[in-house]
Regions:
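Short acidic, Gly/Ser-rich segments with clustered Asp/Glu that frequently serve as metal-coordination loops
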Residues: 118-120
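Nucleotide/phosphate-binding catalytic cleft detector across ATP-hydrolyzing
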Residues: 1-116, 126-241
Length: 241
């Protein structure tokens, strides 16, 4: 099969590509689902850098709550690529997240990290450079987008795509924004069967996301309750990242 585009260029074709072009997602729920396509994506990213850093050390951040087979797939991806890696290490994504935002994971007695991704949300409690508790929820941006699509269809009799739903989520779904606003989007009028436009309110978008976000909040509360008391006291001081 020929590959025409990767990354954002490929995503822009999602739901718009002709029948002879298939848009696929190499990752599914935080792990590699299509190894061949993931190899091509890695190769494209390395080419974008203009060189293959031969002999480099690679560190891959993988979800904590996945199987050893799924973790090995990440290792094999780099080890058998053109990167010619000197070493390949798999680390807990929560540790990498904390280091990435400048936290001292080794001296901290209690850190709570929430990684909200495309298809999953990972909750992790860290202490002394180790993962104390971790949970991978099958809820992410994609679930919110699908909920928005369904809500617009039900309430407006109007069909929008996931990319449009994602734009609504970013522009109207900010929970701290108290200003009421509406956004005009393109789609298909289901009653007439023709293309059209509709104004979608931020209230409709937020209501669509409520169930999924509530699930994440409940999971956070449950994990805090299961956290050892000394670690929990530190988290209550520092907050959630």
């Amino acid at each position: 099969k020929d590959i025409f585009a990767v990354g954002n260029a490929a995503y822009a074709m999602y739901e718009k590509a002709p029948e002879n072009i298939q848009v696929v997602f190499p990752m599914h729920h935080g792990v590699i689902a299509r190894f061949h396509e993931m190899q091509y994506l890695l190769r494209a990213l390395l080419k974008r850098e203009g060189r293959y850093p031969n002999g480099a050390e690679y560190v891959i951040a993988a979800p904590t709550d996945v199987t050893e087979v799924e973790k090995k797939a990440f290792y094999d991806l780099v080890h058998h690529s053109a990167a010619r890696a000197k070493t390949v290490r798999i680390v807990d994504r929560a540790i990498a997240d904390a280091v990435g935002i400048g936290l001292d994971v080794f001296s901290a007695k209690g850190i709570f990290v929430v990684n909200f991704g495309g298809e999953t949300t990972e909750l992790s409690v860290l202490s002394g450079g180790k993962t104390v508790l971790s949970r991978l929820l099958p809820v992410g941006g994609a679930a919110l987008d699908e909920a928005i699509v369904g809500s617009v269809r039900h309430n407006k009799e109007f069909l929008i795509g996931r990319i449009t739903a994602e734009q609504l989520r970013w522009q109207c779904g900010i929970l701290k924004n108290t200003n009421r606003r509406k956004l005009t989007v393109a789609g298909r009028d289901l009653a007439m069967g023709v293309p059209g436009a509709r104004q979608i309110s931020d209230g409709l978008v937020r209501a669509a996301m409520k169930d999924s976000l509530s699930e994440i909040v409940r999971a956070i509360q449950s994990m805090i309750e299961r956290t050892p008391p000394d670690v929990r006291s530190e988290i209550l001081k520092s907050g959630i990242y």
